[in-house]
Amino acid sequence: MKKNLHPIMLAGTGSDVGKSVIAAALCRIFKQDGYRPAPFKAQNMALNSYATPEGLEIGRAQAVQAEAAGVPCHTDMNPLLLKPSSDHTSQVVLNGRPIGNRNAFEYFRKEGREELRQEVNAAFDRLAARYNPIVMEGAGSISEINLRDTDLVNMPMACYADADVILVADIDRGGVFASVYGSVMLQTTEDKKRIKGVIINKFRGDIRLFESGVKMMEDLCGIPVLGIIPYYRNIHIEEEDSVVLDYKRMQAVEGKINIAVVLLRHLSNFTDFNRLERDERVHLYYTNNTEDLAKADIILLPGSKSTLDDLYELRRNGVAQAVLRAHREGVTVMGICGGYQLMGLEIHDPEGVEGEIRQLPGLGLLPVITTMQGEKVTRQVNFHFLENAETCQGYEIHMGETRPVPGVSVVPLNRLEDGGEDGCFVNQKCMGSYIHGILDNQAFIDYLLEPYAEKLECHTVLDYRTYKEEQYDKLAEHVRSHLNLPLLYQIMSGND
């Protein structure tokens, strides 16, 4: 029987340093080494979320990490989720259920923080009773000392869990010595003792050139450098931060099926398109440029955290007109979740669930009307699209109800295994669905691409589940080969 290990927390010198991906790697490594790990992030801020088997909502990163660990995802892995709806306001999701909208000042003030702290601590305790080790992830930088008293996710959480903290730094952005040294020196005396190691992430070039730098950093901070993880390009792990959109392709190319994802201001769940991005038959790109939309064979309208605001912006910047023009010219248009709502005749928000806009006309491509509601639908679903016999999987996360225009007969796109219906189907080039993950199903992808068969240069079909498992193993091998795992296990065994 394996000896129990201390929890480990991957804390960061800043945002987007690679904490989530390294956490996924460690989850897979511990699984490979015979442990039963589970991920934990007390508070996550993201628009990419996922539905648990119980029909509750967590951050997508923790769902990915759970998949890497080989365990079902659960709200205890991410008890507090913030979903931004504007620059200043977020929907607060506690233990998988929305409890209201808060602006930043309301959320970070001290009143009510202890109740939230008790909730995230209780979630950790439940998780730690079922799994070992717990692979914890901090949020952003651990150096925001002005937020220390109300912090729920970084060093106070590590202290509660009695976790060994590993500081992750991104050398690719420069200033790694200052960021590591500053992050350590800004901690309290007790918190400094909790930081047991440093991981230098995203290194480019010959690692031997940094050997002297490792010694300098260890001498400066008094903390061992556990590893230098090289930058990689050939490993593909789903990421939830919107910053990754900055690195995605933005233009059409010749010789493949061009699929344009409309780049909404409040785009959510862009992981819906990861499977298509790996399909060699197509070229998928993100754009809100009307000229690039005109070059697409298929236009996908993605999910949105603020559908009415995005609809208003699409009309203002000409994208709405470009989509309608493309549709008239024979381009396929499909909407997912908020994108499905955008394609309807009207969107109503009588109670101001999303904000101040109460009603707008939709794109008018589907004979449906959406009414925003405070009750959120969150569930995993099995379904069959149209007359297809293959069972597909996906999940729903939305706060609107979409119904047919009165007096109009609508063909549902999907029939759910529980007897329900989803979406609207006009023809093979015009449809919408509430189901996230619909584009992870090979049968549906083949149906979507079918009208463009003459453009296909490659007929290789990707088994996405097998592909993801291979990527987790590749990531684990990459991190394992550049990390001092014996020292990490020694630290987590309490022998540091």
Question: Residue ranges of each PLM-predicted region?
Answer:
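Short active-site segment of divalent metal-dependent hydrolases/proteases
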Residues: 340-341, 439
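Catalytic nucleophile serine of serine hydrolases
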Residues: 337
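A conserved active-site-flanking secondary-structure segment within enzyme catalytic domains
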Residues: 344-394, 399-402
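Flexible phosphate-sensing "switch/lid" loops adjacent to ATP/NTP-binding sites
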Residues: 1-325, 332, 374-375, 384-496
